Amino acid sequence: MAKKAKSRIINVRLISMAMTGYFYTFTRPRTSLPMSMLKYDPIVRRKVLFLEQKRKGRS
C-alpha cells in the first residue's frame, strides 16, 4: 500500500520566550521557514518573542 501524502499546510504552536507557558496556534505552509513573531503575552502583560516549538512524540 502507498503511504498517505503529507498535507501542504501544518498547524504550529508558537511558545512565549518569557517562559510563561502561554502559546498561540497558527497554520503555515510546510515548505516555509519556522515562524517567529512578537505577540502580546497576557501573563507578563507585554509583547514578547514567540518561537515555533519543535514537535515531539509524533511519528
UniProtKB/Swiss-Prot annotation:
Q: What is its main location?
A: mitochondrion
Molecular function terms in GO for this entry?
Answer: structural constituent of ribosome
| Annotated Gene3D superfamilies | Ribosomal protein L33 (2.20.28.120)
Q: Name one GO cellular component term.
A: mitochondrion
Does this entry carry the keyword Ribosomal protein?
A: yes
Give GO terms for biological process: translation
Source species, domain of life: Eukaryota
As for subcellular location, the record says: Mitochondrion
* Transmembrane segment boundaries: none
Keywords from UniProt, A to Z, are: Mitochondrion, Ribonucleoprotein, Ribosomal protein
Matching entries from NCBIfam families are given as: rpmG_bact (TIGR01023)
Say what the protein does.
Answer: Component of the mitochondrial ribosome (mitoribosome), a dedicated translation machinery responsible for the synthesis of mitochondrial genome-encoded proteins, including at least some of the essential transmembrane subunits of the mitochondrial respiratory chain. The mitoribosomes are attached to the mitochondrial inner membrane and translation products are cotranslationally integrated into the membrane.
Instruction: Report the family membership.
Output: Belongs to the bacterial ribosomal protein bL33 family.
Q: How does it assemble?
A: Component of the mitochondrial large ribosomal subunit (mt-LSU). Mature N.crassa 74S mitochondrial ribosomes consist of a small (37S) and a large (54S) subunit. The 37S small subunit contains a 16S ribosomal RNA (16S mt-rRNA) and 32 different proteins. The 54S large subunit contains a 23S rRNA (23S mt-rRNA) and 42 different proteins. bL33m stabilizes the tRNA acceptor stem in the E-site.
PANTHER family attached to this UniProt entry = 39S RIBOSOMAL PROTEIN L33, MITOCHONDRIAL, LARGE RIBOSOMAL SUBUNIT PROTEIN BL33M
What name has this protein been given in UniProt?
A: Large ribosomal subunit protein bL33m
Organism equals: Neurospora crassa (strain ATCC 24698 / 74-OR23-1A / CBS 708.71 / DSM 1257 / FGSC 987)
Gene name as annotated? mrpl39
